[in-house]
Amino acid sequence: MPKNNSKPLMVYNSLTDKKEEFTPINKGNVGMYVCGPTVYSESHIGNLRTFVVFDLIIRFLKSQGYKVRYIRNITDVGHLEDDGEDRIAKKAKLENVEPMEIATRYTNDFKEQLRQLNCLHPDIEPLASGHIVEQIQSIEKIIAKGYAYEAKGSVYFDIDKFRKSYTYGKLSNRNIDDLISNTRELKSQKDKKNSFDFALWKKADSKHIMKWSSPWGDGFPGWHLECTTMSQKYLGENFDIHGGGMDLKFPHHDCEIAQSEAIYGNQPANYWIHTNMLTSNKKKMSKSTGNILLLTDLINDGYFANAIRLFLLSAHYRSVLDFNKKALDDANSLASRFFDTYHNLNIIDIELKSNELNDVNNKKPQISRKELENIDVDCKNALLDDFNTPKFISELIKLSKTIDKIVNKKLNINKGNLEYLNEIFMKHLDILGFDLLDQYMLYSQIEREAKFGLQFSMEKSGELLDIIEKIRSKARAIADYDTSDFIRDELSKLGYEIQDKD
């Protein structure tokens, strides 16, 4: 019998620190908000890990029949340094350009990197600078509830007042008294009642470029406010999933919860999902430590974008992932393997149509529908268990090996089961976010002829073999032995033997 296919989706909820069965607010629909980048510099692969993980989560939810509304913001104003200066404005001063030029440059760069990694576009990608009016309205609501105060043109969230009715620090489980004793006094904080109060609105001096009019004077919104405002606008005051990197738990997400409770009296999201960090030589990858790795550099070094995506998914999202060259090399090989498996499915289809498998391989074991259903269930169950991508990839490798057995004529399959096998493989490859077209285009023209020429027309197989052999001869003539050996080995897998005369 096929394996049990009725397991629920279990999600680790950072709010409760345990796995919980996922139950959406509205059956069949999922509202998800993921904190996007602050666009003051190029995103490195440690930043990109979060967005690749949530891309897979969205793909899986959609494969399970959910209609997902995915919101991912762009922070183009309001992310403050410890000295109270906006990060984007600070970078603009260094480069002597307009702040929005910095924001636009790195927003475009971020989107291009996610395109290369085959990430789906969010349904809405709001800019913080495009929601100033709504953020001012949020501040007014918090003030009206008594949880914020104005001080010399700035507005701060009153954590002491908030603590009388709610718990602050639910996600990080930070002890507020420890925070108070360990918070250093900064010049920019002198107007606060308490050093741990956070800014909802910051007064801007006359030289500040990124500023807007407000009831409290010219200024700009605080970083934490934008996500509360925009998630509420596009998903409502209570939605299903809020995601982001683990480093956002405190203070950003704790502050979001506080703001939402101050305005609406309830937490914004039912499930909080946090991705862990990427390290390099066991040290956190960050701009401040100078050990960042850029996607463009890795691609220029010869790694497939698919491979980088596979690497970022190779560890469970809640685990620390350490970068090393061997792991990336292995991911590169695996990307090639999955593409070869896709190609092999086409070969099997051609051979079935020509009756070659039935004639030559009729005494070999026949893979059954139940076996294929079990493979499908194993892949699905891996992701039902808190999006366990290492297990999911492992099951896909098993599936790939099964297809290898068929193409190597160690296992037989009928046409109906082949169609189902192809459906399974393509479905899970899509959930993985594997970009077949991108992988194909990265092969050289010679490699394409060698790898894919046979699948187009069995009727002209002799002509195609002649062309492929000519390509191989030209490769040998210019001492391109990697390509010539590649062609020989690939043809050998198809049952064709090439003997070199020299």
How should each PLM-predicted stretch be described?
Residues 1-40, 55, 112, 133-347:
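Alpha-helical recognition segments enriched in aromatics with Gly/Pro capping
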Residues 71-77, 105-110, 120-135, 153-162:
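Short, glycine/charge-rich beta-strand/loop segments that flank catalytic centers
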Residues 292-502:
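Structural preference for alpha-helix termini/caps and helix-kink/transition segments
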